[in-house]
UniProtKB/Swiss-Prot annotation:
Gene: ndhK
Any single GO CC term annotated in Swiss-Prot or TrEMBL for this entry: chloroplast thylakoid membrane
Name of the featured protein: NAD(P)H-quinone oxidoreductase subunit K, chloroplastic
Function: NDH shuttles electrons from NAD(P)H:plastoquinone, via FMN and iron-sulfur (Fe-S) centers, to quinones in the photosynthetic chain and possibly in a chloroplast respiratory chain. The immediate electron acceptor for the enzyme in this species is believed to be plastoquinone. Couples the redox reaction to proton translocation, and thus conserves the redox energy in a proton gradient.
Binding site for [4Fe-4S] cluster: C43, C44, C108, C139
Lineage: Eukaryota, Viridiplantae, Streptophyta, Embryophyta, Tracheophyta
Length: 229
């Protein structure tokens, strides 16, 4: 087999040529121009909004806040996600173009926070709805912590392969029984038809014993006679 001899490059040519791969170039362009979607439901968004000011200046990271999901590739779920807000969040995520990333910001977003014990209307973890890339704990996280989370996301983007990013994400995304959602195949189906498994019961279906389970120690007749009103 004939050996192939490559031409010897002079010093000037070596200093003006950068060798890289198309995948690395794509990763560099994406990590340098993350456009976050303005999505906030609680106090954590106040900390994120402070990044826009001159003190932290998150423009130096190439972050451009957008109000449309079709122009964003990053969403920071800042704040509590309620049951009524869950379908809207999934719809916003589905409308974002690929590749897209998610940062779960705050304890309420990650685990439900202080609402995770006995709340009937709070989603206990946003990762039950959409895939999460970076978890940012705190109540609320400081702006410095948000910058650190964005830095970690940039490092993750720098070493990822695009084929791995567009693979089918979680063939079956399951919703907890407590939240009473249907089990759907994927969040990236283009449909946002998550509905409650059981329709809410009306007040007419509630028995009198259940409705008046906790009675006042003073009857209404005694309260009227004593002039309490």
């Amino acid at each position: 087999m004939n050996s192939i001899k490559f031409p010897v490059l002079d010093r000037t040519t070596k200093n003006s040529v950068i060798s890289t791969t198309l995948n690395d170039l794509s990763n560099w362009s994406r990590l340098s121009s993350l456009w976050p979607l303005l999505y906030g439901t609680s106090c954590c968004f106040i900390e994120f909004a402070s990044l826009i000011g001159s003190r932290f200046d998150f423009d130096r990271y190439g972050l451009v806040p957008r109000s449309s999901p079709r122009q964003a590739d990053l969403i920071l779920t800042a704040g509590t996600v309620t049951m009524k807000m869950a379908p809207s969040l999934v719809r916003l995520y589905e409308q974002m173009p690929e590749p897209k990333y998610v940062i779960a910001m705050g304890a309420c977003t990650i685990t439900g926070g202080m609402f995770s014990t006995d709340s009937y209307s709070t989603v206990r973890g946003v990762d039950k709805l959409i895939p999460v890339d970076v978890y940012l704990p705190g109540c609320p996280p400081k702006p410095e912590a948000v910058i650190d989370a964005i830095t970690k996301l940039r490092k993750k983007i720098a070493r990822e392969i695009y084929k791995d990013k567009i693979r089918p994400q979680q063939g079956n995304r399951c919703f907890t029984t407590n939240h009473k959602f249907f089990i759907v195949r994927s969040t990236d189906t283009g449909n946002s038809d998550q509905e409650l498994l059981y329709p809410p019961s009306s007040t007419s279906e509630i028995s009198t014993e259940t409705f008046f389970k906790y009675k006042s120690p003073v009857s209404s007749h005694e309260l009227v006679n004593s002039g309490g009103f």
